[in-house]
């Protein structure tokens, strides 16, 4: 077992605090409308430029192991805030730094660290309740646009696109962010269900100008096994041909004689037909096929399955689903349709979401729910260079997370004003003893830190602006972008309640633990023994010289 390096008391806390401050100082320069960028060196490729707090925090590793422990604990605050709310990482880091700095001063003055932590926790619990009272619902497009704009660093185009996307696919709809090919940001909305499976044969293409397959009001056959024998579906094909409607086959695979026969029939115009592989694998494939069946009016039966003792060769038109339309490219299939059973299915999936503990399962359930709810929207980010593209994409993703959080729990006045108002309301809170009262005051003072940093980053005097804001009431605050005082809601400066709440809770949680630290243990640095070894060049040269003499 490797030897350990152990530090105690004020020496340990001083090292830890230095690490906290190095990381937080790097992150907090990005806060507010006049916050600056941070350039991150990469081991390969061009450096990346970001204004995202968690991206900066993740890059920081310090050489001193004790300092690094402090930095990593604050990094955990940013990561947790990012995972839960998707934004507010800089605010969370700044709050943690402020609580740790104020708290360690109190510890150095002789306060009981455990009572300090209890006081901080008590203040945060009360502050969260007050935040919820200040919160107002965020349901209209204007508020969603404002939240997106603020989170995207005052980019109104991004805010408008996010609002439009949520309007088209619903609050539960899937909205993804991708790198575009042009200079302008674009929104592409896909109604219905899309999955990553393209056509099995290019000979099915009926729109050569686009290279796609388009079917109007098609029948849909869903099978959870391979189809290789054409006899299994021959009678069904005859019935479909008589109906005059197209047919889409979704199966585990379609091969050999069956695929060849379908291609020939399609090319001769006997029946309009297309085939794709079923999406997903295992249990997820079954779930997705069931979702498609709901989307396509499939009432009389479920997916054709051997588990249900259903024979493919006995399938009739009544066993098929129907859709309004289908578009198939070489990579994707889009099915547009809606069934009356959708609402019931959505309720079932929502229940599974509540019960699920796996992040992966929750992500996939959310995708399924979105496809039944309205569709998929793709935000394509435009930029002139790859470096700008990466920076902008990160901002758009932050803005998207912020708007989702706003819809979920509402919004409060932005620019650090909500925390200042909450601090005023809990300033008279009392603990069980004086040390707890000091902890409460530490938390209250720290809640001013985001406003102070926004002002500092805009080049103004933090104390003057903070006092002016504290003299006001309600949503009265400071607009750092225009250097004006007024109603933050009317200025369109909003913060999602969930983001502010998460930042405060996670900052206090980790900072409280750091304040109560008395000992730090890490591996001792390994000594470099290479300097003690004899230089190989001396002996080698001597040998060479000797050999030269012999020759």
UniProtKB/Swiss-Prot annotation:
Keyword ATP-binding applies: yes
Compositionally skewed regions (Gly residues) per UniProt: 539-551
One MF annotation (Gene Ontology) recorded for this entry: ATP binding
Top EC group: isomerase
Sorted UniProt keywords: ATP-binding, Chaperone, Cytoplasm, Isomerase, Nucleotide-binding
EC number: 5.6.1.7
CDD domains for this protein: GroEL
Catalytic activity: ATP + H2O + a folded polypeptide = ADP + phosphate + an unfolded polypeptide
Subcellular location: Cytoplasm
Protein residues bound to ATP: 30-33, 51, 87-91, 415, 479-481, 495
Residues in the signal sequence: none
A GO CC term attached to the entry: cytoplasm
Region called Disordered, residue ranges: 523-551
Subunit structure of this chain's protein: Forms a cylinder of 14 subunits composed of two heptameric rings stacked back-to-back. Interacts with the co-chaperonin GroES.
Recorded family membership: Belongs to the chaperonin (HSP60) family.
Known function: Together with its co-chaperonin GroES, plays an essential role in assisting protein folding. The GroEL-GroES system forms a nano-cage that allows encapsulation of the non-native substrate proteins and provides a physical environment optimized to promote and accelerate protein folding.
Protein name in the entry: Chaperonin GroEL
The species this protein was found in: Buchnera aphidicola subsp. Chaetophorus leucomelas
Taxonomic lineage: Bacteria, Pseudomonadati, Pseudomonadota, Gammaproteobacteria, Enterobacterales
